Swiss-Prot record:
Belongs to the ADP/ATP translocase tlc family. Provides the rickettsial cell with host ATP in exchange for rickettsial ADP. This is an obligate exchange system. This energy acquiring activity is an important component of rickettsial parasitism. It holds the Pfam family TLC. This is ADP,ATP carrier protein 1. GO terms for molecular function: ATP binding; ATP:ADP antiporter activity. The chain crosses the membrane at residues 34-54, 68-88, 93-113, 148-168, 185-205, 219-239, 280-300, 321-341, 349-369, 380-400, 439-459, 466-486. Disulfide bonds join 37-85. ATP binds at residues 436-442. It comes from Rickettsia typhi (strain ATCC VR-144 / Wilmington). It is found in: Cell membrane. NCBIfam families: AAA.
Length: 498
């Protein structure tokens, strides 16, 4: 009897630690490996792209890249994807897009990166044009280092195309609903484990003691890893199509039904929906406020990171460390987030994100505005300079804001849709995706880039007081929006219960 109980206990423990059935490993493990490779590239690209742009062009250029290059490129990429869907089958689309990224990584690694003087315009010409046209100097500087700008854009598109679109489309196609409940939680843990691995890889290859290649080509091994990873993604995808999608135990094509088209609204229709429904408007305001406030702090923080770590290698190593902490904090929030939601009210759970942003943002900006006071009173005690402390608090703010997003912010936002009637829920969510998604991601960059165009003599140092003021105004509006949405939410919940 005791043996039977012990076996049952071990069986239950195994289901908690590894909820995948033995026969499902053939499907889950290659899918998980694909996701790991995609995320290894994703987190490596995120660390490197800023290192090139910030140190060679300037931190201010990031807002211009996001607004005027990345956003249009994402739209063009989606148009091309839709066209490919009309002429190729899904498997071949995956090969075409992944091969495009692989080809670009090879081109950048062996041509654009090693020979910048051959591909970039003359530095003196760019400087003279920047002085002649100060309002457009950041556009001119971006053109002057166009290969780094293209790398930044491709890095941004990798996350959108490879992870959000191709991987999840494939996973959703071949994963049954009963499997998804167990598979997807494990994917979440795996996704965040790729971040610490990236940190270790970057730290090793860019360390000054690692002498695999010449000093001016330190990034080559990282590019080779990304190229290899891209090859492995293609090979794994091919193997799954040959061995998993042909196994009736793991995939039944008759169960793949045509899904009803999601409600799609135009930009104008989305605006009308948000302005005519106070409830939907509040949800949109939450998403916009999150995106804009994160971008405003992130821009200032990266300018301070550049001051502390002025070289490409040092900056990239630091961003790798940032990914390390972000990965573990995200895992921690994933584990505790569901418990928080079960034990507190919707209002309390929804308030955690803006209050955390306000407190950490206030600490970050305090170390910038009062650096001389801190230097006199705290530097000796804390054995750190005001700049180091500002960078540290900026990292804490960014790590927490991204960690809390996936566990609490997204969960409370999605809960807010539940009490709505079906028509408003479907159309409202579509409207929020169009307006909130676009303005949230690009809103902060638009504010910053417009500011630098109107005031060309300003950099982040001079503009920080203005960006800080906008940040606090937006977070306060966010808090009021949460309170307003909670009132509407409680009315609908009580109405539905009665």
């Amino acid at each position: 009897m005791s043996t039977s109980k012990s076996e049952n206990y071990l069986s239950e423990l195994r289901k908690i630690i590894w909820p995948i059935e033995q026969h499902e490993n053939k499907k889950f493990l290659p899918l998980a490996f694909m996701m790991f490779c995609i995320l290894l590239n994703y987190s490596t690209l995120r660390s490197i792209k800023d290192g090139f742009v910030v140190t060679d062009i300037g931190t201010e250029s990031i807002s211009f890249l996001k607004t005027y290059i990345v956003l249009p490129s994402a739209v063009i990429a989606m148009v091309i994807y839709v066209k490919l869907c009309d002429i190729l089958k899904q498997e071949n689309i995956f090969y075409v897009i992944t091969s495009f990224f692989l080809g670009y990584f090879a081109l950048f690694a062996f041509v654009l990166y090693p020979y910048p003087d051959l591909v970039h315009p003359d530095h003196k010409t760019i400087e003279s044009l920047s002085l002649a046209y100060p309002n457009f100097k950041w556009f001119i500087k971006i053109v002057g280092k166009w290969s780094f700008a293209s790398f930044y854009t491709i890095a941004e598109l990798w996350g959108t195309m490879m992870l959000s679109l191709l991987f999840w489309q494939f996973a959703n196609q071949i994963t049954k609903i009963t499997e998804a409940k167990r598979f997807y939680s494990m994917f979440g843990l795996l996704a965040n484990l790729a971040l610490p691995v990236t940190s270790v890889v970057i730290g090793y290859f860019l360390h000054e003691k690692t002498q695999i290649v010449s000093e001016h080509l330190k990034f080559i091994p990282l590019f080779v890893i990304m190229i290899t990873s891209s090859f492995l993604i293609i090979l794994t995808y091919r193997w799954m199509n040959k061995n998993v999608l042909t196994d009736p135990r793991l995939y039944d094509p008759t169960l793949v039904k045509e899904k009803k088209a999601k409600a799609k609204l135009s930009f104008i229709e989305s605006f009308k929906m948000i302005f005519t429904s106070k409830y939907v408007g509040y949800i949109a305001l939450l998403i916009i406020a999150y995106g804009v406030s994160v971008n405003l702090v992130e821009g200032v923080w990266k300018s301070k990171v550049k001051e502390l770590y002025p070289t490409k290698e040092a900056y990239t190593i630091y961003m790798g460390q940032f990914q390390f902490y972000q990965g573990w904090v995200a895992i921690a929030f994933m584990l505790i987030g569901s418990n928080i939601l079960r034990k507190v009210s919707w209002l309390t759970a929804a308030m955690i994100t803006p209050l955390m942003m306000f407190i950490t943002g206030a600490a970050f900006f305090s170390f910038i505005f009062f650096d001389s006071v801190i230097a006199m009173n705290l530097t000796g005690i804390l054995a750190s300079s005001p700049l180091t402390l500002a960078v540290m608090f900026g990292m804490i703010q960014n790590v927490l804001s991204k960690g809390v997003k996936y566990s609490l912010f997204d969960a409370t936002k999605n809960m807010a849709y539940i009490p709505l009637d079906k028509d408003l829920r479907v159309k409202g969510q579509a409207a929020v995706e169009v307006i909130g998604g676009r303005l949230g991601k690009s809103g902060g960059a638009i504010i910053q880039s417009t500011f630098f165009i109107l005031f060309p003599a300003f950099g982040f140092i001079e503009a920080t007081p203005y960006f800080a003021s906008i940040f606090f105004i937006i977070v306060i509006l966010w808090i009021f929006a949460v309170k307003g949405l909670n009132k509407e939410y409680q009315v609908l919940v009580n109405k539905n219960e009665n």
